């Protein structure tokens, strides 16, 4: 089973999406940004920084997740860009 939470309080703010796969002890943090086409790369980087700075993985860690992956996603119209970061745990 996968557990999903949206706009949930975690760390020092509210992250867009948290996913937990308890049997594998895997957690996923997703932060999304809307950006102009020429700023999509930067928006992905900003999303990953926000995940770290606001400690959005804190709730996943307290729930026992050991492997945490962060996704910074930027959207512009029908296009999106994704950057992946691994949480140091």
Kindly give the residue locations of the regions a language model identified.
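Short, small-residue-biased leader/transition segments that mark boundaries at the very start
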Residues: 2-3
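C-terminal amphipathic alpha-helical interaction region
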Residues: 6-11, 17-23
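Nucleic acid-processing catalytic cores of prokaryotic defense/repair systems
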Residues: 10, 46-53, 74, 83, ...
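Domain-level recognition of nuclease-like catalytic cores that cleave nucleotide substrates
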Residues: 59, 63-89
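Conserved catalytic cores of phosphodiester-cleaving nucleases, focusing on short active-site segments
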Residues: 17-19, 26-36, 54
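An acidic- and aromatic-residue-enriched active-site/binding cleft used to recognize and process polar
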Residues: 9, 22, 33-35, 73-75
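Switch/connector loops and helix/strand junctions flanking conserved nucleotide-binding motifs
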Residues: 27, 38-42, 78-84
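Mg2+/Mn2+-dependent nuclease catalytic core
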Residues: 35-57
